[in-house]
Amino acid sequence: MQKILVTGATGFVGQHLIEYLKLDGYNIRAISRKLIPGVDTVICDFLEDDIPENALKDIDIVFHLAGYAHDLKNEPGIEQTYQKINVNVTVDLLSLSAKHNVKKFIFVSSAKAGGSPVRGVCAAEKDQNDPAGIYGKTKREAELKILEKGRKSSTHVSILRPALIYGPKVKGNLQLMMQGIKKGWFPPLPETGNQRSMIHVDDVVQALLLLASDQRSNDEIFIVTDGKTYSSRDIYEIMCST
């Protein structure tokens, strides 16, 4: 059975990925700031520590989910934090993966890496629009660097750009919105005609597992959605009905 390394294992997607990998009987290791029950855990804080080289020993596939997404524009040093976590750590982890002959490196990027969406136009992987915001810019920079580096090594790189992810244990704005609706303080949203793509966390996990098993994904970027579009009003009504 293949040995898997997961970063960001305690995050929203990471928790679901770990559950699926356990069910399928994979040998799992995680890099995390805290011990994960039932998982071989290498303790590391990417913001403070170098990546422990022993974390990559005997690993076949890396799922790199860890990233920095907090939009705290006025926080001192915030740009350096984005650069270190989203770019430097990603490149360093791929370098160590190549050194240890890891077969596949799968990077979870973001739809924001493809640039700001154009109303009424379906985004494509080949789009080269300028990403808006430091989060999208650093994710795009990481993509370009690891694709180039991967082509020069024996470690194949695949990149996933998920749309807004929803599902059990969701965090961030969707979590706050659900809490507000349940407690009665979130106001009804009008229909404005805005549209956005989304994807269920289980579908993201299935996409990751497919990238790991299909060689056609080598050195490629993939945008994933659930195939539908939602307005803010749609999301509000769905949450009210659950």
Stretch-by-stretch model annotation:
Residues T155-Q175:
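Flexible, glycine-rich beta-alpha linker
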Residues V91-I134, G150:
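Conserved Rossmann-fold NAD(P)-dependent oxidoreductase catalytic core, especially the SDR/UDP-sugar
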